[in-house]
Amino acid sequence: MSTVLCCVLVLLISVALCMDFEERPSSSWRSEQTMFLKSHKSRNLLSLRDLQQPDHGKMKRSEESAQNQCESLHGYQSTLQNDTHTHNFNDLSGSVSLAWVGDGTGVLLVLTTFQVPLFIMRFGQSKLYRSEDYGKTFQDITDLINNTFIQTEFGIAIGPDNSGKVILTGDLAEGKVTKIFRSVDFGKSFVTSELPFHPLMQITYNPKDSNILMVYSINYDLWLSKDFGANWKKIHESVCLVKWGIDDTIFLTTNPNGSCSDRGTLELRKSLDYGKTFKTIGNRIYSFGLGGRFVFASIMTDSGSTRMIHVSVDQGETWDMAQLPTVGHEQFYSILAANNDMVFMHVDEPGDSGIGTIYISDDRGIVFSKSLERHLYTTTGGDTDFTNITSLRGVYITSVLAEDGSVQTVITFNQGGEWRPLMKPWNGVCDSTAKHPSECSLHIHASYSISMKLNVPMQPLSETNAVGLVLAHGSVGGAVSVLSPDVYVSDDGGYTWFQALKGPHHYAILDSGGLLVAVEHNPTHPISQIKFSTDEGQCWHAHNFTDDPIYFTGLASEPGARSMNVSLWGYRDTILNQYWVSVTVDFRQLLSRDCQENDYIQWLAHSSDINSPTDGCVLGYKERFLRLRRDSVCWNGRDYKVTKEPTTCPCTLTDFHDFGFYHEENSSVCVEQPDLIGHSLEFCLHGRKEQLQTSGYRKIPGDHCEEGITPERKEIDLSKKCVSNLLRTEQLTKEHSFNSAPIIAVVIIVLLISAVAGVIFIKKYVCGGRFLVHRYSVLQQHAEANGIDGLDDLDTLEGGKTHYHDDSDEDLLE
């Protein structure tokens, strides 16, 4: 009877998840199970039928070895058994926080906390543990922080690079002063300091100097320390948002009336001398964001109901209007990714549609091309699947929303120039709900699926030093499935995929891709096995790490994918209590042999047609890498560096974006947009109106092609002033003076009338976007929660987050 009830319960939960995920009022269960974008196709989005061409069907590394049987790896069980280390944390902690200190040091700090609210008070305790051997053994060092309860919301603040600096913030009790605990020796010892304020956020380090710290107070005052927290000085009041810029620059927004809720009336200021002096560089600010060498400001227009983006490439000294659509109160801008060459910007559509358009900037951040329409980006939770595949340049994955509400994964291999569905895994079985065999593809689960509470424990994973490797949860069919996903692996940067593991798993990349590890995700049942692969996920082996299974909660390995140690965290549930358990497995003795020169082979990235002279050319050049042979069981080592050989390619039309034009399907030729025929493309540059003469092509930022095809492009100075909303009106009228008072009066009146008329005309018709279709978008909220700097963040506190949704490539503005 209990079995029947369980089955019924599982079925009901599955149906509920389907309805919750799709947000559609009615449809059959079968159609809700998977979804596919069919009815609407972006101009830059290739269909699956387009990919059935010979140049896209080349057999890849994973498929070439598919016929090889997995050979048994002898003797590994006894080897790993001797290198498996278990530690029990015998306290009543309800949560655990982990932080790696330094690179290659093996130092791991673990903070356990236990809290019990009692009426208007709360009781809590913290314990601090330290490991010097990658988590194999731990020492209780709680006495070093005087048994103080640590505020877990501030986390463990680790200094940049290999500074060895650590800061813990104590809990404020009974109105007393706040204490911080500082370490300069990787947590071996701590010094206690009292703060002259109560912090509102985690203390942040200067990225280039770990002795310089900055933090908000609960009164929105900005405090700075130059001696690693020993002494503090208040450098500004009424601070709404603050960020570290390049070259020790501090950017902040403030409101003279002290209210940060009046968005659109803020001032943007910067300091080059750690707060001794501040310079106002913008007014009417809603918010601002940083990305690469760009500074973006979201400002209110004269109407007070819309916002637009201004951009600066000289740290706010001069500003230009970004050619992006304006947005209203209910919309937002979001920087998805940025570097010194370009920016991906998401512009939200009006209404609560959950979609928008991705635009790509030029190298000045001013002119934008439309990259992808119907990009899925929910406004409520700020969830987007936009992911930078760091193991291969130019590759990004995200999701689009079809008009019927279905979700589909798309990928670009040339930095947003063209998007396409993912290829069906060569060993994958297409879901029966696919309407046509040609519509069967792989769909990746990322942030959106996690936010919808699907059974997805991890987002896609890639590492810069594990060339071509990508691990992700996904499903094969017509669209994203709400059923439990499987783990898929790509060894060529996302061109081809194969199913590596059945069901959801936690996974990690070790030894620069020479070793993959995974643990089954099953919150309701204890586990005792860890799986590992030495051939990029083709074959997997199981190691029983314990005879007493644990309820598994997470996998931890040192950042950078160079370690050979991985820790499984979980808890054991006894009759009397629960306690945390850490199991660390050292795989170094498994890969006992150092890799030699003959263990590596040459691999051409982005290869699709070996007979083409441009095979592998992406963004103007091709790269050949030395990669570990699939059948080589050896140790890359911590000092392993990616070996690559770049070769410049001649320019082709694929090295250019459309501007005022669009690609015809199955063609790289730009065709002029019907609504732009007969119109000039105009934009504002450094306060003057420019006219862009182009045959429809704009070179992709960061493209290094030489010679070959070079479409004509010319900018003409129209000698007409563009007035930036970022400057005060009185600042723009102090430019001319004459000797005669009457002439001055007449000229000033004429100039004022002309200026006002010109401003209205240019803002409305030129820079506002009547003629300009490909424009850049405003940045969205929650930018910092995802890592990149955002413009229109609703939450103005950084909270100690790092940069980008690239591993951090995401920025939001509004």
UniProtKB/Swiss-Prot annotation:
Position of the signal peptide: 1-18
SUPFAM superfamilies linked: Oligoxyloglucan reducing end-specific cellobiohydrolase
Modification after translation, per record: Palmitoylated. Undergoes cysteine S-palmitoylation which promotes the partitioning of the receptor into an endosomal membrane subdomain where it can interact with the retromer cargo-selective complex which mediates its retrograde trafficking to the Golgi apparatus.
InterPro entries for the chain: Sortilin_C, Sortilin_N, VPS10, VPS10-sortilin, WD40/YVTN_repeat-like_dom_sf
Family annotation (Gene3D superfamilies): 2.10.70.80, 3.30.60.270, YVTN repeat-like/Quinoprotein amine dehydrogenase
A GO CC term attached to the entry: Golgi apparatus
GO BP annotations listed: endocytosis; Golgi to endosome transport; vesicle organization
Lipidation (S-palmitoyl cysteine): 767
Topology class, membrane: Single-pass type I membrane protein
Residues on Cytoplasmic side: 763-814
Glycosylation sites: 82, 146, 257, 388, 544, 565, 666
Entry's localization field: Golgi apparatus, Golgi stack membrane; Endosome membrane; Endoplasmic reticulum membrane; Nucleus membrane
A Pfam family assignment: Sortilin-Vps10
Top-level taxon in the UniProt lineage: Eukaryota
Membrane-side (Extracellular) residue stretches: 19-741
Keywords annotated in UniProt: Cell membrane, Disulfide bond, Endoplasmic reticulum, Endosome, Glycoprotein, Golgi apparatus, Lipoprotein, Lysosome, Membrane, Nucleus, Palmitate, Receptor, Repeat, Signal, Transmembrane, Transmembrane helix, Transport
Residue spans of the BNR repeats: 129-140, 181-192, 223-234, 269-280, 310-321, 359-370, 410-421, 488-499, 531-542
Family that this chain belongs to: Belongs to the VPS10-related sortilin family. SORT1 subfamily.
Protein name: Sortilin
Species of origin: Danio rerio
Designated gene of the protein: sort1
